[in-house]
């Protein structure tokens, strides 16, 4: 696993924030400042151990950058399709996501399968776009208040890195934890800080300084025509025989 972090306030301590994710990415850490935001990455080198696999990774035309944690299944097949148009500098699935986004736009997410959470900085649109995998295997948190925005693989990276933020406890989340023994999404223990739900896409506009959309990009299809749903007494009888 790797760790990702990013935000809009250039005065935040991204080095300390990404170092707090050292256990997720012990091989290397890197912070890179862009025009509208800062991206940081803690690397666990698995695919393409060379420096070419380091993140944040930027497209060859310089318009789109990414920080990514996860694994894309069968990415080689998509890479072969994209190689007809794009020149690849690495053997990573990270670069496949990057070029798929350039080629297909929002629809690129339908081309990939796997466990992932990542952030794309689109310089052309002045947007940060977050994605989380369909089953929610890889975590992704975000903070938004007073026009400021940040995201990270773990909550403590936000608390450590966003140095001027007042982290007030959300007591409704505390109640949920005491009642359910966990905090339901999208809440976290802090106000203005949330978990991005599984299979969701978030778009933050860097010019307007606001979240313009949080949308579900995938929905599980259940085939009800094969007798999955049966009468309650039948189900109870089956349960007793187990």
Regions found by a protein language model. Give the residues of each.
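Cysteine-centered catalytic environments shared across enzyme families
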Residues: 1-242
